[in-house]
A protein has these predicted regions:
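Conserved catalytic-core motifs of GNAT/GCN5-like acyltransferases
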Residues: 111-112, 127-148
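Short hydrophobic/aromatic beta-strand or adjacent loop that forms the aromatic wall/cage
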Residues: 47, 148-152
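A short, well-structured alpha-helix characteristic of acyl/acetyltransferase catalytic modules
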Residues: 1-38, 159-161
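Alpha-helical elements of Rossmann-like donor-binding domains used by nucleotide-donor carbohydrate transfer enzymes
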Residues: 11-18, 91-98, 152
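Conserved acetyl-CoA-binding loop-helix of GNAT-fold acetyltransferases
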Residues: 85-102, 119-120, 124
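Acetyl-CoA-dependent GNAT
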Residues: 26-74, 80-85
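Conserved active-site tyrosine of GNAT-family acetyltransferases
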Residues: 121-129, 153
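Conserved GNAT acetyl-CoA-binding A-motif
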Residues: 102-114
Length: 161
């Protein structure tokens, strides 16, 4: 279940810090540093931040922003604290369907570092909604000297007038 992240702020920050200097942090932050979200109480109606909770246990964090003027969702971020828990994907997918069907958003864009284990799920979502995937080759080098691609997804939703 998605609940406002502010309710789990300290727990989310602690959980994310447990992944400092790890490959998981690299995939979340998109660089070699450690990134902590700034979980806000006042999000001005454009920043959405959620704790993903299962039976009272924090299992993930999901965030995105909406530019209401251009009807675009961007700045998506997802961190799983309970690998292989399908409820994370189910809850995030429900939120994405709400964005599409209730908010009638025109466009969603998100980015990731190639090799992220969730890439196959992002590809599936992109295919389902006839989106596009752009791969920029060897954009990022990790601590071990391995190059990773940068991946950009975009999906445009045609609205009936």
């Amino acid at each position: 279940m998605l609940v406002p992240a502010i309710l789990y702020k300290n727990e989310i920050l602690t959980k994310i810090q447990e992944y400092n200097y790890s490959e998981d942090m690299m995939y979340y932050s998109g660089y070699l540093g450690n990134a902590l979200p700034s979980i806000e109480a006042d999000t001005n109606g454009k920043l959405y931040q959620y704790a993903i909770v299962d039976d009272g246990k924090l299992i993930g964090y999901f965030t995105y922003q909406i530019d209401w003027y251009s009807s675009c969702v961007y700045g998506c971020g997802l961190f799983s604290f309970d690998r292989h828990n399908i409820k994370i994907g189910i809850d995030v997918y429900r939120e994405l369907k709400k964005i599409i069907n209730e908010y009638h958003i025109h466009r969603i864009e998100w980015r990731m570092i190639g090799g992220n284990p969730v890439e196959k799920h992002y590809d599936k979502f992109c295919k389902r909604y006839h989106g596009k995937k752009y791969v920029l080759t060897d954009v990022f080098k990790d601590r071990c000297g391995k190059y990773h691609n940068a991946v950009i997804y975009e999906t445009i939703f045609e609205q009936e007038e």
